[in-house]
Structure formats: C-alpha cells, structure tokens
C-alpha cells in the first residue's frame, strides 16, 4: 500500500511501539475473513498479526479520512471504555466528531431524533461492540473503518485495520498512529520531526488507579512539607531564643524562698505526734490492770 516511497515505510520506532503495546497479539479464535492478516500461530493458540499488513491498512484508512473535506463529517465511535479516551483525543487532534460511550440507536437513520447526524465516514473501535452504528451505516451507504481483531466479524466493514482491539495500550496506540498519519498527510506536522504528543495520552486509565496515584502524590507532598518544616524552621528560632534562656535562669531564684519556708514552718509545730504517743500508753495500763483483776 505504501508503494516504493521510503517516506511511507514503517520505521523501526513504530515497530517497537507496536510490539511494546501488544498490537500484534490476536485472539485464540480466527474469522475466515481475517486469515489474510495472520502471520503465525503460537503454541498456546494465540494468533500473531502481520504488522506489515496493519501498517498498510492504517495508511489506507488515513488516506480515506484525509479525503473528507470537512473533518467534522468523520464520526469516530467507541462504546468500550478502553477506547473512549483515545476517541476523544483523536477527535481533538483531527477535528472529527466523537461518540464516546453508548451509541443511541437511530442516530444515523431517525431524522426526528435531536442527535441525528449525517456523517460521510465512520470509524469504530470494535466491530462486535459497535455493531449498531455499523448496521445503521449500511442503511445510509456510509463507508466504515474498523479496528479488527482476529475474531472480529467484517460484515459492513469497508476498511479493516488488523490489530489487537482488546488491550488498552494497543487501542490507544492505534488511534495515536492513525491521528499522526492523518496530520502528516494533511501537512499539519512534518515527517522529519517526531510528534510532540505522546501515546500515553491516548491510553485508557482506570479511575481507581487514578485515585490511588493522587492519594500517593498527596501523601508524598505532606511528608515533604513535614521534613522541610523540621529541618528548615528551627534554625532561626534557636538564634532568637538564646537571650530568653538567660532570663529564665535569673528568675528561678525568686520563688525558691517561699517554697522552703512554707513546708518547714507547718510541719515543725505539730502536736499530733504527742497525742499518738500518749494514747497507746494509756491503753496499755488499762489492759494491765484488767489482767490483775482476773488473777
């Protein structure tokens, strides 16, 4: 598909990105129409997709998108969570119309609906999950592009891009590659320089993981503030408190005099000691006298 042009050939960096994201890994099932895109089959039953065919169909899809004069006439759809963020980023980069989440039936066929649209091109993430927009596109003669896995049905799909459409990294990378090629063919960005947008922005992130990362970052910030307060704040305080230490040492001598006089005078004159000593002596004499009477 790229012909003899070296500019359109797949670079080594692109191959490494595909392999790192697992784009070449298909499923254990194979549709008969996807056999032409299969390279080999692993011992565990997983089919390996030919990345050369993936790159050729990616360029063909980019050419079809660029051929649309108004970018808003291109509808990009993803009902699965793994592709919703990528679809929104693709639409922001290329000017397409995104539909992330549930697709309202009748959007392409029911003119009474408030959300009725008449796009000129449709791009979906998964033909199996996005079967409703593909079916409606067939009613209105709408050309379609789809990211297809080894077991994806190709009914109503005009341009199938073979890839792994189950993994979050693979789906995000494919939408990133497609957006980059569209911008390159339009002349918005140059092929000589790398695109400043990273593929990580197109990856799906679990909300729970985002909350955990935010909590960890907040805890780290609190600990940093505590350490900075312990090591930096006391330095000026010690220098300012030095003259106060001399004042406290001088003031200790004043309350020492009444503390010594108060307990010594109270406890010195106590007649209680004489009373307690006299009481047992009197009792002793009485008991002695009693014993003499019995005798």
Curated annotation (Swiss-Prot):
The modification Phosphothreonine is found at residue 97. Required for the assembly and/or stability of the 40S ribosomal subunit. Required for the processing of the 20S rRNA-precursor to mature 18S rRNA in a late step of the maturation of 40S ribosomal subunits. Also functions as a cell surface receptor for laminin. Plays a role in cell adhesion to the basement membrane and in the consequent activation of signaling transduction pathways. May play a role in cell fate determination and tissue morphogenesis. Also acts as a receptor for several other ligands, including the pathogenic prion protein, viruses, and bacteria. The keyword Phosphoprotein applies. It is found in: Cell membrane; Cytoplasm; Nucleus. Monomer (37LRP) and homodimer (67LR). Component of the small ribosomal subunit. Mature ribosomes consist of a small (40S) and a large (60S) subunit. The 40S subunit contains about 33 different proteins and 1 molecule of RNA (18S). The 60S subunit contains about 49 different proteins and 3 molecules of RNA (28S, 5.8S and 5S). Interacts with RPS21. Interacts with several laminins including at least LAMB1. Interacts with MDK. Interacts with PRNP. The mature dimeric form interacts with PPP1R16B (via its fourth ankyrin repeat). Interacts with PPP1CA only in the presence of PPP1R16B. GO terms for biological process: cytoplasmic translation; ribosomal small subunit assembly. Keywords: Acetylation, Cell membrane, Cytoplasm, Isopeptide bond, Membrane, Nucleus, Phosphoprotein, Receptor, Repeat, Ribonucleoprotein, Ribosomal protein, Ubl conjugation. It comes from the Eukaryota. PROSITE patterns: RIBOSOMAL_S2_1, RIBOSOMAL_S2_2. Residues 54-113 are annotated as: Interaction with PPP1R16B. One of its GO terms (cellular component) is small ribosomal subunit. [DE]-W-[ST] repeats lie at residues 230-232, 247-249, 266-268, 275-277, 293-295. NCBIfam families: uS2_euk_arch. This is Small ribosomal subunit protein uS2. This protein appears to have acquired a second function as a laminin receptor specifically in the vertebrate lineage. The keyword Ribonucleoprotein applies. The modification N-acetylserine is found at residue 2. The modification N6-acetyllysine is found at residues 52, 89. PANTHER family: 40S RIBOSOMAL PROTEIN SA. Residues 161-180, 205-229, 242-295 are annotated as: Laminin-binding. It comes from Mus musculus. Belongs to the universal ribosomal protein uS2 family. The modification Phosphoserine is found at residue 43. There is a cross-link at residue 89 (Glycyl lysine isopeptide (Lys-Gly) (interchain with G-Cter in SUMO2)). The record marks 115-116, 133-134 as: Cleavage.
